[in-house]
Amino acid sequence: MIQTQSMLDVADNSGARRVMCIKVLGGSHRRYAGIGDIIKVTVKEAIPRGKVKKGQVMTAVVVRTRHGVRRPDGSIIRFDGNAAVLLNNKQEPIGTRIFGPVTRELRTEKFMKIVSLAPEVL
């Protein structure tokens, strides 16, 4: 569960390393975001010569959370950390590679590009 002020790792090669959630999108006064939800983030840590710079405000999709996601069969998939993938204005990933596993819940029309780039889908 990601909320405002939550710090996330970046799971792509866009140049950002750490981002902070500044808004959970999708309804007024929405408090938490889970896997597959879109959030507004600000870049807190970035590498030199990356596509994004420190201080930029971006859109991102949550791909991994410590809280995890519950499947219809009752199983829960949890991760060691929270991670997001940065998106452009057309909701496409900025990076060309995805690091680490992503969940099957991202297999919607919007995020098929992220699923196809990911090395492992759980």
From Swiss-Prot:
GO terms for cellular component: cytosolic large ribosomal subunit. InterPro entries: Ribosomal_uL14, Ribosomal_uL14_bac-type, Ribosomal_uL14_CS, Ribosomal_uL14_sf. Gene3D superfamilies: Ribosomal protein L14. Keywords: Ribonucleoprotein, Ribosomal protein, RNA-binding, rRNA-binding. PROSITE patterns: RIBOSOMAL_L14. It comes from the Bacteria. One of its GO terms (molecular function) is large ribosomal subunit rRNA binding. Pfam families: Ribosomal_L14. The keyword Cell division does not apply. GO terms for biological process: translation. The keyword RNA-binding applies. Belongs to the universal ribosomal protein uL14 family. Part of the 50S ribosomal subunit. Forms a cluster with proteins L3 and L19. In the 70S ribosome, L14 and L19 interact and together make contacts with the 16S rRNA in bridges B5 and B8. This is Large ribosomal subunit protein uL14. It comes from Stutzerimonas stutzeri (strain A1501) (Pseudomonas stutzeri).
